[in-house]
Amino acid sequence: MSETEATGVTDDSAPAIETETVSDAMEHTAIGVVESVEGAIEGAEKWVGDLQRTVKESKDTAMRSARSLRENSTSQFRSIQDFIPHALTQYKTYENAFFSKVTDELIYAKEHPAAAIGIGVAASLVLMRGPRRFLFRNTLGRFQSEEAQFLKAEKHVQELNMSVDLMKKESRKLLERTALAEKDMKRGLSELMNSGNDIHRLAKSVHKAECEAADLMDGLRQIPGRDAIKLRAEVASMTSLLRQKRIALNKRIMGMSDLGVSV
């Protein structure tokens, strides 16, 4: 017996078996793909359903919140509307009571001027700082314990020390500024005096030159000719300029004398 006869499989039946095996494998693969697609579709449908449910719940929540907010706003607005007339009534009541009280007091003051004057004087004394402190010390101040009075006095002493320290610092700064200003003033005064002396010497020199120009002018008047006339014109112009400078210098010297600077 041959091997093919022993196994019961002939050469003609082998291709049929292979074809059947391939078809079974393809069928199983197709079934797996279909199942995978169906699972994916079911998952997508579930996700869409959850999304729709979430959107619906969010929408319902938003609508409930808006409805609650509108109801609360409406109730608050109604409460305010109900409170306004009550508040106006209370305001008018207090206003009438205040003005009636003021009117009664004015009428009483008009009918009893002596009492009104006494009350006014007493009120003014109470409002003033000195009498108020005196009254406090002689009335309510007597009921304070010694420890409380000591603590209050100690606090005042500390405040006074702080004020004194502050004034010391301010006075030290002011003294330093004053010393610097005094030094600058002395230096400026010295420079001003030196400038004044220089101006005074310059004024004397200008006056001397003016006198010499006047003498030269007298001498040129005695010389005939056009050249002498030309020189006289130049000397006259020079003399006028020297006179103007001398007047300006004398004014500056007078101004410095008015400031207390000896020149």
Curated annotation (Swiss-Prot):
InterPro entries: RGS1-HXK1_interactor, RHIP1. Proposed as a reliable reference gene for normalization purposes. It comes from the Eukaryota. Disruption phenotype: Long roots in young seedlings and large inflorescences in adult plants. Arrested seedling development in response to glucose. Keywords: Developmental protein. Expressed constitutively. GO terms for cellular component: cytosol; mitochondrion. GO terms for biological process: cellular response to glucose stimulus; regulation of glucose mediated signaling pathway. Interacts with RGS1 and HXK1. Required for some glucose-regulated gene expression, being a physical connection between RGS1 and HXK1 in sugar signaling. Prevents roots and inflorecences growth. This is RGS1-HXK1-interacting protein 1. It comes from Arabidopsis thaliana. The gene is RHIP1.
